[in-house]
């Protein structure tokens, strides 16, 4: 198996949003494929569940893979194939197994099986194994599990895993209507596509002995198996789409950079062998080995992901940062009228914001004061900054000082001017500037105040200081 070019496969079902766990599996498979010039990453869409499949989910899979850098134009990429297109081959193999005596027909109902076993949790008892039933209505095809055993799965991550045949029932491989079950279709497709490595989540480990038996029954050498550790939340519960934020698209829509997501997902269960954490995928590929993947559960820590993302944002040059922010600035995501947005103003403020945000969507709250007609109303910030004896007095004095036509409207002179006002009020600059910041930007936290005043302009600053004073006076009446 190791003499052949690596052929990995990623086989998602188009039945929902693209899960971060699936993203990690795809990346691990992609990394293996990239390690050899002839290595292949095969994308197979397992679309046999017609009732749940939707075309937009398939499109979403392709978009998500592309965002992760798994590009269908890359020579290492093969597919996408669709499992439904191989239905005839699945039936053909099922019939072959029957002819060879490796499978048999069974007409037992679920109720009959449970009645014989006396326990609904016990599996099939092999009742039809030697009855010699022919194909017919109501007769499913079961694989004849060999007596003896065990089946040994050599897992690259978990080591040697034994499955006693007494615990493996003669499992159904085709329904009574002839349609194959997933366990058979999956193996047939892997054989047909010459897959050498099956790298997937540990929830599939229980199916592996059945699939290995099928590989062997078809006269094929089983692939390299590797079952990845489960991904858990902060409560150490398996990530669930009903409870946790698990859709890759949700993270990207929030402003997590694809390269940061790739970096973080690659480290869920694997590490490069040293203390490095922030590193590009291209440097991870030659270091990646399945044997180095941890079998213990991997904690999806969004706080750590945010920290990773912040590092990647700060590493962007200013031009690229501006481009990456564009989706949040000029669309329905922006809270200001489109005509208010000034690209030159944003380019000027971008370096100040770039060092402060962890996800791109946060850019809006840092720069909205520049493009809104009035600053946002944040009552908590207002109450904190506009203390009696400070708020009104500081705003009045600041407005008077900022109205001086001889005051140069740049950050440094503005800071010096406000320091003078603060000293006259007997206040330190930090406490003195809070009312001005809230009056002008609406928030107690944000970009450097004096650069913000410079960009906003003299007339708009004066207008907002007056409006804040009027609000204070109205509240005191």
Swiss-Prot record:
UniProt subcellular location: Cytoplasm
Q: One GO molecular function term?
A: zinc ion binding
Coiled-coil spans in chain: none
Provide a GO biological process annotation. Answer: glutamyl-tRNA aminoacylation
The catalytic activity, as recorded, is: tRNA(Glu) + L-glutamate + ATP = L-glutamyl-tRNA(Glu) + AMP + diphosphate
- Provide one Gene Ontology cellular component: cytosol
| The keyword Cell membrane is annotated on this UniProt entry | no
The record's free-text note on cofactor binding: Binds 1 zinc ion per subunit.
Which cofactor names does the annotation list? Zn(2+)
User: Which residues of the sequence carry a binding annotation for ATP?
Assistant: 241
InterPro entries xref list? aa-tRNA-synth_I_cd-bd, aa-tRNA-synth_I_codon-bd_sub2, aa-tRNA-synth_I_CS, aa_tRNA-synth_I_cd-bd_sf, Glu-tRNA-ligase_bac/mito, Glu-tRNA-synth_I_codon-bd_sub1, Glu/Gln-tRNA-synth, Glu/Gln-tRNA-synth_Ib_cat-dom
EC number of this enzyme: 6.1.1.17
Span(s) of short sequence motif 'KMSKS' region: 238-242
Motif extent ('HIGH' region): 12-22
UniProt-listed PROSITE patterns: AA_TRNA_LIGASE_I
**UniProt entry keywords in alphabetical sequence:** Aminoacyl-tRNA synthetase, ATP-binding, Cytoplasm, Ligase, Metal-binding, Nucleotide-binding, Protein biosynthesis, Zinc
Q: Where along the chain is Zn(2+) bound?
A: 106, 108, 128, 130
| NCBIfam families, per the entry | gltX_bact (TIGR00464)
Q: Which HAMAP family match?
A: Glu_tRNA_synth_type1
Query: Which function does this protein serve?
Result: Catalyzes the attachment of glutamate to tRNA(Glu) in a two-step reaction: glutamate is first activated by ATP to form Glu-AMP and then transferred to the acceptor end of tRNA(Glu).
Q: Which family does it belong to?
A: Belongs to the class-I aminoacyl-tRNA synthetase family. Glutamate--tRNA ligase type 1 subfamily.
Q: How does it assemble?
A: Monomer.
UniProt name for this protein: Glutamate--tRNA ligase
Q: Which organism is it from?
A: Thermobifida fusca (strain YX)
């Amino acid at each position: 198996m190791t003499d052949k070019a690596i052929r990995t496969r990623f086989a998602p079902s188009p039945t929902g949003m693209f899960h971060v766990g699936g993203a990690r599996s795809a990346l691990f498979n992609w990394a293996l494929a990239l390690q050899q010039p002839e290595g292949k990453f095969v994308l197979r869409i397992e679309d046999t569940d017609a009732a749940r499949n939707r075309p937009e989910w398939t499109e979403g899979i392709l978009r998500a893979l592309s965002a992760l850098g798994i590009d269908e134009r890359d020579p290492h990429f093969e597919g996408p194939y669709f499992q439904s297109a191989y239905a005839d081959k699945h039936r053909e193999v099922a019939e072959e197994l029957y002819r060879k005596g490796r499978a048999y027909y069974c007409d037992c109902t679920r109720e009959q099986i449970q009645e014989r076993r006396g326990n609904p949790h016990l599996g099939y008892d092999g009742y039809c194994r030697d009855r010699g039933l022919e194909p017919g209505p109501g007769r499913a095809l079961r694989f004849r599990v060999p007596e003896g055993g065990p089946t040994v799965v050599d897992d690259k991550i978990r080591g040697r895993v034994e499955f006693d045949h007494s615990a493996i029932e003669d499992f159904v491989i085709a329904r009574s209507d002839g349609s194959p079950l997933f366990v058979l279709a999956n193996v047939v497709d892997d054989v047909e596509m010459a897959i050498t490595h099956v790298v997937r989540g540990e929830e599939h480990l229980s199916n592996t002995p059945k699939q290995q038996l099928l590989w062997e029954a078809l006269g094929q050498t089983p692939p390299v198996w590797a079952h990845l550790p489960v991904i858990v939340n902060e409560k150490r519960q398996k990530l669930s789409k009903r409870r946790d934020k698990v859709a890759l698209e949700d993270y990207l829509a929030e402003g997590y950079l694809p390269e940061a997501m790739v970096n973080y997902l690659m480290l869920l269960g694997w590490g490069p062998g040293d203390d490095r954490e922030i590193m590009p995928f291209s440097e991870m590929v030659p270091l990646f080995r399945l044997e180095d993947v941890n079998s213990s559960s991997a904690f999806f820590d969004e706080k750590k992901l945010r920290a990773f993302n912040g590092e990647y944002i700060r590493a962007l040059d200013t031009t690229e940062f501006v481009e990456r922010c564009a989706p949040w600035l000029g669309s329905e995501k922006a809270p200001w009228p489109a005509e208010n947005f000034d690209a030159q103003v944003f380019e000027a403020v971008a370096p100040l914001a770039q060092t402060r945000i962890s996800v791109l969507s946060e850019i809006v709250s840092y720069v909205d004061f520049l493009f809104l007609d009035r600053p946002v109303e944040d009552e908590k910030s207002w109450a904190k900054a506009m203390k009696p004896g400070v708020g009104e007095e500081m705003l009045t004095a600041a407005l008077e000082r900022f109205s001086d036509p001889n005051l140069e409207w740049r950050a440094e002179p503005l800071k010096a001017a406000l320091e003078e006002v603060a000293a006259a009020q007997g206040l330190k600059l930090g406490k003195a500037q809070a009312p001005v910041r809230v009056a002008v930007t609406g928030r107690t936290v944000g970009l450097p105040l004096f650069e913000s005043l410079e960009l906003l302009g003299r007339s708009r600053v004066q207008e907002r200081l007056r409006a804040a004073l009027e609000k204070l006076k109205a509240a005191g009446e």
